[in-house]
Amino acid sequence: MGRVRTKTVKKAAKIIIEKYYTRLTLDFDTNKRICEEIAIIPTKPLRNKIAGFATHLMRRLRHSQVRGISIKLQEEERERRDNYVPEVSALEHDIIEVDPDTKDMLKMLDFNNINGLQLTQPATQGGYGGRRN
């Protein structure tokens, strides 16, 4: 079983990650030295706990987002993905292939004036009751 982390450890680690994300690594010893440099942590065990939790969060951040931590790099990446516009629309097709039954249905619904409809022959299947290998 793991230990319960206090609110102090969690808050300190999150703040350190948000401010110094580029300096932190996935290595505990490196993160311990960085925590020692950038923050005034009163005791050695508390410093180790904060560095350990920061390392834990960095490993989680490698795979996905962590709730409560907003990193500018991730926000920029998310914004870039949201604003992406493809050069060729996936919805625009010049030719729509339909079989004769679908063409008749479109005529009945008064959609026979759609541009780009191309009549194709339906693919024939073996039918029912046949032997399967």
Swiss-Prot record:
GO terms for biological process: translation. Disulfide bonds: none annotated. GO terms for cellular component: cytosol; ribonucleoprotein complex; ribosome. GO terms for molecular function: structural constituent of ribosome. Keywords: Ribonucleoprotein, Ribosomal protein. It comes from the Eukaryota. Belongs to the eukaryotic ribosomal protein eS17 family. This is Small ribosomal subunit protein eS17. It comes from Spodoptera frugiperda (Fall armyworm).
